[in-house]
Amino acid sequence: MMNTERPAGPLRPPHPPHPPRYLALAGPTASGKTAAALAIARVHEVEIISVDSALVYRGMDIGTAKPSAAELAAVPHHLIDIRDPLQAYSAAEFVADAQALIAAITARGRLPLLVGGTMLYFKALLEGLDPMPKADPATRALIATEAAEQGWPALHAALAEVDPVSAKRLHPADSQRIARALEVYRLSGQPLSSFQTTKLIATNEGVTGARGQKCLNIPENDRCLISLEPQNRAWLHQRIAERFDAMLAAGFIDEVRALRARGDLQADLPAMRCVGYRQAWQALDGLWPMSELRDKGICATRQLAKRQLTWLRSMPERRVVACDAPDALDQVLALARDFVNAGNKLQGQP
């Protein structure tokens, strides 16, 4: 049995006035990020910064697999429940908020631990963010194949589900622009319209957001990205199915009904387009039988996980841990310990 209690010896992150350092834990949905983060928190003095575009919304607890009240109380968490579902939360806002939190947590003598699966946010912090993804021949070819099989009006309808703002501007026969909008969404997980309004630009000093603020320019030696990735995709698929079943049993449909009952939320809001919520909303609208919700929700979640893994593989500095390995948690804790101890040595701490 692995001991995850905080030891008496010094395993403390560097203290100010030293430059900030941070540890990051990324992975696809259902890969075990929350459990790993809490295990790290039992050993090291950390505060968790959520890197999840769905967890920012209040009243969306079950379908987002939000940490429980006990988990939130066990260690300080940030960027959870900070927006009403009526409000948007952009990548630019995340960069600005994360910048301030990394500095503040460091000033308190603790280590920022960034945890989540919104890869666009990680990319903004780690690499800077281009205005929008470049053309990808493989994605374009797949879209062209779908268009040949289904027709452009069908793809326009698919675009309307993920990017209603762009779809509203485009004619169903405007194949070139529909293809580009779908390409951007599939590559980034974000609608084309969000890139057109966010206006993030990458600079040599960091990322400048819509509010004119830059993220911290932290050298690679002062940051560590641990990536939870399955060796066996079937393992992750099983976890996704089990988690969706648990959400349904916990009252997920009632949670979506309560959101609809507010009367001020619409299906095209960013919050309501979150995976699971979109499918439940459509089922409640009668677009398909409620009996199909489970399969559609699981399918959409698997597609999300596939996109997340594609993003992760484009991050060369990540340190991969096979999340389906029996000793996955031990590996995560070893990487975290090495990172913290390396920082202590750099600062002359024992």
UniProtKB/Swiss-Prot annotation:
Matching SUPFAM superfamilies: P-loop containing nucleoside triphosphate hydrolases (SSF52540)
Top EC class for this record: transferase
GO molecular function, one term: tRNA dimethylallyltransferase activity
Reaction(s) the record says it catalyses: adenosine(37) in tRNA + dimethylallyl diphosphate = N(6)-dimethylallyladenosine(37) in tRNA + diphosphate
Keywords assigned by UniProt, alphabetized: ATP-binding, Magnesium, Nucleotide-binding, Transferase, tRNA processing
Region (Interaction with substrate tRNA): 52-55, 176-180, 273-278
Pro residues composition bias: residue spans: 10-20
GO biological processes: tRNA modification
Annotated binding of ATP, by residue: G27, P28, T29, A30, S31, G32, K33, T34
Cited Gene3D superfamilies: 1.10.20.140, P-loop containing nucleotide triphosphate hydrolases (3.40.50.300)
EC number of this enzyme: 2.5.1.75
Residues annotated as binding substrate: T29, A30, S31, G32, K33, T34
Site location (Interaction with substrate tRNA): T118, R140
Entry-linked Pfam families: IPPT
Cofactor(s) in the UniProt record: Mg(2+)
The keyword Transferase appears for this protein: yes
Region called Disordered, residue ranges: 1-20
Subunit structure and binding partners: Monomer.
Family from the record: Belongs to the IPP transferase family.
NCBIfam families (UniProt xref): miaA (TIGR00174)
Known role: Catalyzes the transfer of a dimethylallyl group onto the adenine at position 37 in tRNAs that read codons beginning with uridine, leading to the formation of N6-(dimethylallyl)adenosine (i(6)A).
Protein name (database record): tRNA dimethylallyltransferase
